[in-house]
Amino acid sequence: MAGNSIGQHFRVTTFGESHGIALGCIVDGCPPGLTISEADLQVDLDRRRPGTSRYTTQRREPDEVKILSGVFEGKTTGTSIGLLIENTDQRSKDYSDIKDKFRPGHADYTYHQKYGVRDYRGGGRSSARETAMRVAAGAIAKKYLQQEFGIEVRAYLSQMGEVAIDKVDWNEIENNDFFCPDVDKVAAFDELIRELKKEGDSIGAKIQVVATGVPVGLGEPVFDRLDADIAHALMSINAVKGVEIGDGFDVVRQKGSQHRDPLTPQGFRSNHSGGILGGISSGQDIVANIALKPTSSITVPGETIDVNGEPTELITKGRHDPCVGIRAVPIAEAMLAIVLMDHLLRHRGQNQGVVTTTPKI
């Protein structure tokens, strides 16, 4: 199975399934000398892990990460960093009724047709459980970016169903279970989730992820443009069906005189581009939005077929999120951090000595 790695200079490879023994990843390319510990990684893992909120799945996994290699006496050695998280709360019996059926809206049918075999327990490799390792690897990238370059990567839930935020207060995000920056919308999110649970249904969501302090010059045109790699990374997150950079699809309604970001000696007057011009970071904030579909793991009966192609009906059992967008916030942060880390190392390797007479704004 290909497609388990991302990045060139900072490369992350994950392995494991939802109901397997453990999840793991190998992080290659992290520079030596970075002070890092399991506790550093655990902070973001605790933000993502299941069973911590009444609004998400009640599968209770501690998600305690173990650093197996690449760190000695609290500092990275420059060699491969091995990370492992054991699965401890699998309930595979919840999926025995669907082992010969394809859950509509999931990867069951496509995995079966591609590989000829599938792990039906919780979706196997296609489960969002895999993203725990992305978050662990992303925590390494986030710490390096912050410590060495002053770059900060943060995200928040901006919309759930028809409920959208009206304001952004970064200080509010960690004060509620929704990662919501608008305290006035928390009650509406709560009411929506309660109603969905009664109905046995789910809802989609939108997340904004922002990186501040990114220097000008990151990105490798033409095929490894920074925005292309960011879109690739964010699109790889489970349930993501759309990615926007900057104003995204709103540019369709804009005129050139409105969309362009005027330059002044003091800096840019606007940031419609989302901090990227020509595939290269402009020095402004990197801004991206992702849209996540509503999960199909719901108790509302749905049509499907079995492995013999016969029609049947399916009701999903198990423990699932009524809105997968809530726990996707730290995942989005991790993926953006991994891309920025990779491009910083690539840029430093080729362009570190580049000097221009034009001042940076």
From Swiss-Prot:
Identify which cofactors the protein needs according to its UniProt entry: FMNH2
Q: Which residues bind FMN?
A: 125-127, 238-239, 278, 293-297, 319
Q: Does the keyword Cell cycle apply?
A: no
Tell me one GO biological process term.
Answer: aromatic amino acid family biosynthetic process
Biological pathway: Metabolic intermediate biosynthesis; chorismate biosynthesis; chorismate from D-erythrose 4-phosphate and phosphoenolpyruvate: step 7/7
- Which EC class heads this enzyme's classification? lyase
Q: Which UniProt keywords are given for this protein, alphabetically ordered?
A: Amino-acid biosynthesis, Aromatic amino acid biosynthesis, FAD, Flavoprotein, FMN, Lyase, NADP
Q: Which GO molecular function terms does the record list?
A: chorismate synthase activity; FMN binding
Catalysed reactions listed for this entry: 5-O-(1-carboxyvinyl)-3-phosphoshikimate = chorismate + phosphate
Which GO cellular component terms, listed alphabetically, does the Swiss-Prot or TrEMBL entry include?
A: cytosol
Q: What does this protein do?
A: This reaction introduces a second double bond into the aromatic ring system.
Family matches, as HAMAP family: Chorismate_synth
What does the subunit comment say?
Answer: Homotetramer.
Q: Which family does it belong to?
A: Belongs to the chorismate synthase family.
Protein name (record): Chorismate synthase
